[in-house]
Amino acid sequence: MSPSESAKKNEKISEEATVESKAFSISVEKQTPDLDGLIVEELCMGNPNGKKAEPGKRVSVHYTGKLQGNGKIFDSTVGKSRYKFRLDAGKVIKGLDVGLNGMLVGGKRKLTIPPEMGYGAEGAGSIPPDSWLVFDVELLNVK
C-alpha cells in the first residue's frame, strides 16, 4: 500500500469513527434515567401538536415486552389488538405508568424497567423473579 493509499484509508477510518461517535452521543442524549432506575429512550417523538399521555388519561399502545438478560419476548400486542388502560391508575406495572407519562401520540419509546418497577421478587408467569424488563412501546391514542 502506497503512503497516499494508507493516508486515505486512515482518513476514512477516522470519518467512520466520528460518525459512530456522533450516533452514540445522540443515542445517549435520548436516554433519560429515572431516579428509580427506569431508563427511557425516546426512539420517535410523536406529533408535537398531538395529545400527550398524562396521569388519568386513557391510553392505547402497542408494545413488546422482553427480558433484558436474554431478550426473550414474554408478551406483545404487535399484530394483535392495541392495549388500552388508564395511565397512573395501577392497572399496569409502575415502569409502564411512569415511562409513558409525557409521551406524544405517534411516539415510540424503549423502557428499561428495574425489577422494583416491574414484577419484583415474585415474578409473573414466564418472567423470573427480580427480572429487568425491556418494553418497546408505541403510543397510538390518548383520550
From Swiss-Prot:
Q: Which cysteines does the record link by disulfide bonds?
A: none
Instruction: Alphabetically list the UniProt keywords.
Output: Isomerase, Rotamase
Isomerase recorded as keyword: yes
> What's the domain of life for this entry?
Eukaryota
Q: Which GO terms describe its molecular function?
A: peptidyl-prolyl cis-trans isomerase activity
What are the boundaries of the signal sequence? Answer: none
Q: What is its EC number?
A: 5.2.1.8
Give the similarity note: Belongs to the FKBP-type PPIase family.
Chain's role: PPIases accelerate the folding of proteins. It catalyzes the cis-trans isomerization of proline imidic peptide bonds in oligopeptides.
What name goes with this protein? Peptidyl-prolyl cis-trans isomerase FKBP15-3
